[in-house]
A protein has these predicted regions:
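Phosphate- and other anionic-substrate recognition elements at nucleic-acid/protein interfaces
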Residues: 1-162
Length: 162
């Protein structure tokens, strides 16, 4: 069984974990077009998900939350990305569950008390998978919390479906 975590933000990620070997099969920074404004690369998202077999995969999609301090475009893009990914999953007949950030964070990150869930997910994934490179690209200096959040969601997915 494969377990997939999807952080659907523009700076999110998609991580696929093999349930038998407990290893990371693939990880992808959320595909986007960058220009004056960042937009989702819907074709690339479809390509990432196209090889998944509906009978052998469980997916967790993070519920979109709009922050009160977000601007109009940020709020729109949050909902847009959430809807686009739900549409792709439905069109491909892939089984998925929607989870709130609080649910997966409380389960996977319990015992980590930095007060910053992004740092906690980076620390958790770096410890759990020390050989994985959590940067968005080889040139990146910072670790990508969208990837680590997606990994945590994939591990949460395994817990709720077992």
């Amino acid at each position: 069984m494969l377990y997939v975590g999807i952080d659907n933000g523009l700076n999110g990620g998609i991580v696929i974990v093999n349930g038998e070997t407990k290893t990371i099969l693939s990880k992808f920074v959320m595909p986007v077009f960058k220009g004056k404004k960042t937009d989702y690369d819907i074709k690339s998202i479809c390509k990432i998900l196209e090889f998944l077999n509906p009978d052998d995969v469980r997916i967790v999609l993070e519920k979109a939350h709009v922050r009160p301090i977000s601007g109009k475009r940020a709020s729109f893009m949050t909902g847009f990305g959430y809807g686009v990914i739900q549409g792709i999953l439905e069109a491909k007949s892939l089984s998925y569950s929607i989870v709130s950030p609080k649910d997966w964070q409380q389960e996977i990150l319990k015992g980590m008390n930095t007060g910053d869930t992004k740092k906690d997910s980076i620390m958790f994934c770096s410890r759990r998978y020390p050989k994985e490179d959590w940067r968005a690209t080889e040139r990146s200096k910072k670790l990508h919390d969208g990837l680590t959040d997606a990994c945590c969601m994939a591990l949460y997915c395994e817990k709720i479906f077992n």
